[in-house]
Amino acid sequence: MATHTSKRRIHRWENNELSEENSTIIYFPARGLMWTHFPFVLGICLEFVGYVLKIVFINSPSISTFIAQSVLLLIAPSLYALSIFMLFSKMARLILMEAYMLIPAKFSTVSFVVADMIGRVLQAVGGGLLSSWNSRNTGRILIIVGLFIQIFCYTFLTFSQLFLHYKMKATPSKIVRDSNEWFQYNFILLAGILLVNGRTIVRVVQFLMGLQSYIGQHEWCLYVFDTVLMFLLPLIFLATFRARNLFKLQDKSVNIQLNKLLDKESVSED
């Protein structure tokens, strides 16, 4: 979070001690940044509950337990992706390079959330239909459509991150030039979305091949290409969070922006 010094300086800005023409600054309240991480935490919880139910199903098989664990494990990674997207959008704004996003943040956020939600709903409905033999094929199709929607979203986000990374190298803002931590943070987000997309592609292959396919009949495939990937993702974020998180990076951005505004104010007073 912002340091005490930065908070005092933000307070000065908020109380209009700077002249109006020099009072533009980009920052997010700490509570807003905390909520940006909420889908990620929820995804971890759903993954945990999903695997607990998987153990319960192995010891005491029932169709309801199977459906519940399947739906939770299908939906949880999309929550990781949602947090990654929101963090990426905020990062682009904090480095004053939102113009280099493939779609402006205010439009892309709504589009991503809606598309991702549609994908999740289709997977949840499809997972429910798997319980009935007559509707099992319909459920499988709905899950596949939902997964393809998410693959499109995640691929778009990947290209957005790569394009912004290129622009950060080619035409960096003053904030980016001040520290390479922004590049490192973008790499963390990029690694996260690649893991989610890789896992989603494996799931599409599984359902395209059918529930009786090799992947469906051999649990090790899902453990290697789903469980391991989704274990690595939160592990990477948790391991790097102390050193690289948006709270600390925002503090750097705010300080640079305020220094620039105060310099302008000093020049205008002279």
Curated annotation (Swiss-Prot):
Localization (cell): Membrane
Membrane topology: Multi-pass membrane protein
Cytoplasmic side: 1-37, 87-93, 162-181, 242-270
Family matches, as InterPro entries: RTA1 (IPR007568)
Record has Transmembrane helix as a keyword: yes
Residue ranges annotated as Extracellular topological domain: 59-65, 115-140, 203-220
Protein name: Uncharacterized membrane protein YLR046C
